A protein has these predicted regions:
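Residue-level signal for tight coil/turn positions that link beta-strands
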Residues: 58-59, 82
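Short glycine-rich, low-complexity segments
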Residues: 1-48, 68-100
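Short aromatic-glycine-enriched beta-strand elements
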Residues: 60-65
Length: 100
């Protein structure tokens, strides 16, 4: 197993999402993907939580590169169907790079 250190930077979400309350979830996810913003999901069907960055995006699903919240290292990749997301938390943190 390799441990990857994740370099992050605090960001101002209002600059990226000036009117987030009027945006569709797909628009929010796309901006998170484009800007490598950390996200936190809760699944309605599986009652599970996932935390990480979006590696791939389309209008129906995303591929999430999961980060362990305790250790801060990548642990898995998950496919998430957008309509199954019950809660989406957008963090004010952007991933700048990953040291290998």
């Amino acid at each position: 197993d390799r441990i990857n250190l994740i370099e992050t930077k605090d960001i101002n979400l209002e600059e990226i999402f000036p009117n987030i309350v009027k945006m569709k979830i797909e628009e929010v996810l796309k901006k998170c993907f484009e800007n490598k913003i950390l996200v936190h999901f809760e699944h309605e069907k599986s009652y599970s939580e996932k935390f990480g960055i979006i590696e791939r995006f389309d209008n129906e699903k995303i591929i999430l590169k999961e980060i362990d919240k305790m250790t801060g290292i990548f642990i898995a990749k998950s496919e998430i169907i957008i309509e199954d997301i019950s809660f989406l938390f957008v963090r004010n943190c952007k991933v700048l790079g990953i040291e290998r």
